[in-house]
Design a protein with these regions (language model features):
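Conserved small-residue
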Residues: 1-20, 61, 70, 78-80
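Outer-envelope beta-barrel architecture signal
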Residues: 24-26, 35-37, 111, 133-137, ...
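Membrane-embedded beta-strand positions in outer-membrane beta-barrel channels/transporters
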Residues: 27-29, 117-121, 174-176
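Repeated loop/turn-to-beta-strand initiation elements of outer-membrane beta-barrel proteins
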Residues: 36-40, 127-128
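Membrane-embedded beta-strand positions of outer-membrane beta-barrel proteins
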Residues: 41, 139-141, 177
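Extracytoplasmic gating/loop element in the C-terminal half of outer-membrane beta-barrel translocons
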Residues: 46-138
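C-terminal beta-signal and terminal closure region of outer-membrane beta-barrel proteins
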Residues: 67-70, 77-84, 100, 146-181
Length: 181
């Protein structure tokens, strides 16, 4: 009851959370070379940003045809038996009920820290290389999106559309060999 009139209604609305675009972005690049080895990594992150979970998360019995029923939407919902442990309001098919309105329950912290890129390599200097006209030979391993630390958990926090279910961010690991003649 934000306006202290003794009832909870539309007059008790207030702004919650942060914008969907981050108010603070950061990045850090580290790297070194030592005795033929090279290493680099890029960390990116953002904070002071929120996501409002959309209808798919709020209304598992919902009003749209693309329902991807997530088991937690039922196991974590309020029932008389789970009244003390429920994390979500009771499931209804009526979308205008108060438990589906915007509230702190549906606004999630989308701050994150991600290891966006990491690469380790080794440059060979072998006696046979000049004899065959080889200038350089390097082996390497590169990884993309290998680690993400976030509170959102249900979606990619870096995506502006993370209020809806989506395919997870792809992790990629590449191995390679560069040879120069």
């Amino acid at each position: 009851d934000l306006n202290h009139d003794g009832k909870i209604d539309d007059n008790d609305k207030t702004a919650i959370g942060y914008p969907s675009y981050p108010l603070l972005n950061a990045g850090l690049t580290l790297g070194f070379e030592y005795k033929g080895f090279d290493f680099s990594m890029l960390w990116v992150g953002a904070t002071k940003t929120s996501r409002v979970l959309e209808e798919t998360f709020r209304k598992p019995l919902g009003e749209t045809y693309d329902r991807s029923l997530m088991s937690h939407q039922f196991t974590d919902r309020w029932t008389p038996e789970t009244a003390a442990t429920a994390k979500l309001p009771r499931a209804t098919i009526d979308g205008v009920k108060n438990n589906y309105r915007d509230s702190e329950l549906w606004v999630k912290d989308a701050s994150y820290l991600r290891l966006k890129n990491i690469e380790i390599g080794y440059n060979f200097r072998l006696p046979f290389m000049p004899k065959i006209g080889m200038e350089k030979m390097r082996v390497f391993m590169t990884g993309y999106n290998l680690l993400t630390f976030d509170k959102l958990k249900i979606s990619d926090p870096e995506s502006m559309s993370s209020g809806v279910p989506q395919y997870p961010v792809m992790r990629v690991i590449n191995f390679g060999l560069n040879v120069s003649f």
